[in-house]
Amino acid sequence: MARRKKGDAVSGWLCLDKPYDLTSTTAVSRVRRAFNAQKGGHAGTLDPLATGILPIALGEATKTVPFLMDADKAYRFTIAWGRDTTTLDREGETTGTSDVRPTREQVEAALPAFIGEVDQIPPNFSAIKVDGERAYDLARDGVEFELPTRKVSIFDLKVVDQPDADHVTLTMECGKGTYVRAVVRDLAKALGTCGHVADLRRTRVGGFSEASAIALETLENLSYEARLSEALLPVETALDDIPALAVTDEDAFRLAQGRAIVLLPRQVETLKAELPPGDRTVSAMSGDRLVALCEMRAGKLNPVRVFQLT
C-alpha cells in the first residue's frame, strides 16, 4: 500500500516578492507551509541579499519548472564604486579599492559593449558545480579555481539613476544564466575602477512580474484568513510561450493514460506555424484544464508530462 503524502494536493504557481536576507529554499518552505502543500520548488535561485520575483511552483506545477528556468529575466541594481569584494556584493571581503568614480556619461558610454551575446565568467560565489561541488562551497573553503567563460545574452542595459558620485543604478533584461554581479565586476574593470553590487532586485521572470507579486508577509496573513487561493496562479502560467491545443474529452482521456492522439491536418499546420524553429512542445488543454505537455511528431501528440488536475 502506497504511503499517503503529507499535506494537501495544492497545485499552481505563486509569484513571490522575496524579501531581503532570505534564501530561496527557505522561501519555498514557508510558502509550502502556508498552503500545507505536498510539494514545491522554485524556478531559479535568487540570492539571499536580493529581493524580488521568485516564482514558486506547488504540486503539479513543479512539472513545468524547467520551462520557466529558461525564461528571460529583468533586474534593477545599484553599483557602489570604489571597492571590489570576494563575493562581488557588499557582504564580501575587500579585494581592491579605487578612488576613480565614473560619471553617468562614462557609464552610459561603456554599456553598448555589454549588450548582445557576450562572454561572461560566472562569479566564484555561485551555485555552479565544479567536479560535483558547488562553486560557493569551494570559494568559502579558500580553494583557488576559475569558472569557464560562457555565452550569455543581454538584451537591454541602461542607467536609470545616479543618486551620488559613489553609486549608480541600472536596469537589465537578459537571458538565462546571466549574473548581475559579473556584469558589475566587468563594467567596473572596463571603467578603470572597482565596484560591487550594493542592491539587487529581480523585477521579472518570464511572465511573472511585480504586477502579480505578493509579499511573504501578505501571503501568511491570507493563510490565517483562509484566502490563499486568491494568490495562486494556474499551473499553465509558466507555459505562456508554448502553443496550446484544445482537445476533446476522449483525447484528454487518452493523453492522461499516456497514449498518443492523432491530429487533424489543419491542427498540424496551425501548430507548425506557432512553434519556434526546432521546437515540438505543445500543451493540451481540456477547457481550462491543462491535460498534458506533449511532443508533436508525425502528425501525433505524444504525452511527455501528464497533469493530475481537476
Swiss-Prot record:
Q: Which SUPFAM superfamilies match?
A: Pseudouridine synthase
Q: Name one Pfam family in it.
A: TruB_N
Q: Which reaction does it catalyse?
A: uridine(55) in tRNA = pseudouridine(55) in tRNA
Q: Which cysteines are joined by disulfide bonds?
A: none
Q: What GO terms describe the biological role, i.e. biological process, of this protein?
A: mRNA pseudouridine synthesis; tRNA pseudouridine synthesis
Keyword Cell membrane, does the record have it? Answer: no
Q: Does the keyword Iron-sulfur apply?
A: no
GO molecular-function annotation terms? RNA binding; tRNA pseudouridine(55) synthase activity
Q: Membrane-crossing residues?
A: none
Instruction: Write down the EC number.
Output: 5.4.99.25
Family matches, as InterPro entries: PsdUridine_synth_cat_dom_sf, PsdUridine_synth_N, tRNA_psdUridine_synth_TruB, TruB_C
Similarity comment: family membership: Belongs to the pseudouridine synthase TruB family. Type 1 subfamily.
Its biological purpose is as follows: Responsible for synthesis of pseudouridine from uracil-55 in the psi GC loop of transfer RNAs.
- By what name is this protein known? tRNA pseudouridine synthase B
